[in-house]
Amino acid sequence: MDNQDRGSARTSRRQFISVAGLAATAVITLATSSTAGAAGPTAPNPGSRVGDPAEAQAVQRVAETLLNSGVPGLAFAIVKPDEKNRKASVTTTYHYGQADVENGVRVTPRTQFEIASETKTFTAALLAKLISRGEVGLDDLASKYSDGNPLPKGIGGEEITLRQLVTHRSGLSDDPPNLSAGCADPTRSCTDEKAKYTRNMLWKGLQDAGALEFAPGSHWLYSDFGFGLLGTLMADKIIPGQEKPPFAAAVAREITDPLGMMGTVIETKATDLAVPYHLDGTRAPLWNNTGAIAGGGGLVSTAEDMSIWAATTLGYGNNPLKPVLTSMLEQIDTQAPENPAFGMGMAWQLQPPTPNFPQRFAKKNGDSSGSNCITLLVPDSGWSITILANGGNAAMIDPAAVNLMHDLVPRQPIFGSSTGSSSGSDVGFQTGSFG
């Protein structure tokens, strides 16, 4: 990866996060006239599970806009209540465009996309599951699980807790200061620098003078470094004694296998991966965050799998993991002292109601050098929207999802109110057992 690839991913992600209220305070309208319609209606690829005409048309409008803006391939997953049984869910999926432009491979239900930072919700799930078993505590010091390796402290001796890691309040920088340590020239970034980043490099990076940007708990700063550390700590707790951090194995054993999410794996194990592309149409390098900070962004997934993830997090079904995933939507911290309206669950950012969309919702997005994704959850109505793309950027994909949310999700809660009462799937945004 070159500096441009790393910088573009970071910038687009940070822009969306730094204006967290934008999507909730104004209806975002996509440019669906002239350019989007120039090629005529775009039908979803074979294998799509299409919803009612109104939904299908709304998705088609968004898909055409993105495809005509240079995104090669897309997958959508929408979860909503079953009209005949509001305690059950219905999933629709839509696949468009190409997973591999040069070889003419279309996006199908099997197509895997890099989900980058949406991986953080799976990392948080490892923590939530260990908490549910009484094996760790949310306010435990992270150093309790670092096998004797010291972690940085604030100038007043403040130590990092698991709560702070899972809510971006640890003070750790976005990327490790020594992220390029595995490159031939450690002073310059390189392709696969994340894959080459070992556990020993992680411990050394944590001792770097630039590792901690502020005292733990005092501010909010999005941190791949922090979630990478959390992923390694929790994976080592679950599967101890491994030479390499067992993040992928821990996620498979504890999370994805029990949910039947067979297409959600660490990137090196992907068999149907969509090729990521730059905005100019050239191939982008694989994100390949498969080393010691994989918990920050190392997984790939499919639209079908992400619908399972969203539905279970909303509280649908009877999988034993349901209470673990729904607990992650409980507010356990504010995003930042200067912006208390925007709360943090475990990895999920919690958005307040606004006049334009009078329901709270949770969001998590992800972007790599050439892939983008986002999932929005509206628990009090039992809806979710996921978009996966092998091109574009967060400034394109995130508003597209918000646009669909405004178009499709009822303005008023279906299950109770949007001020803290639980949804039909027993989920709310009130502070719960972790608060």
Where do the PLM segments sit?
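Twin-arginine (Tat) signal peptide motif
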Residues: S8-Q15, T35
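N-terminal secretory signal peptides
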Residues: M1-T11, A23-L30
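Short, surface-exposed loop or secondary-structure junction motifs
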Residues: R86-D100, K153-S369, C373-I374
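C-terminal region of N-terminal signal peptides and the immediate post-cleavage residues
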Residues: T29-P46
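Short active-site loop at a secondary-structure junction
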Residues: S69-P72, E102-L165, L212-D224, A294-G297, ...
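Short, well-ordered beta-strand elements
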Residues: K364, N372-G391
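Short, conserved catalytic-motif segment at the N-terminal edge
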Residues: D52-F113, E135-G137, P152
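Short, gly/Ser/Thr-rich active-site loops of penicillin-recognizing serine hydrolases
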Residues: N339-P340, P353-Q359, G391-G435
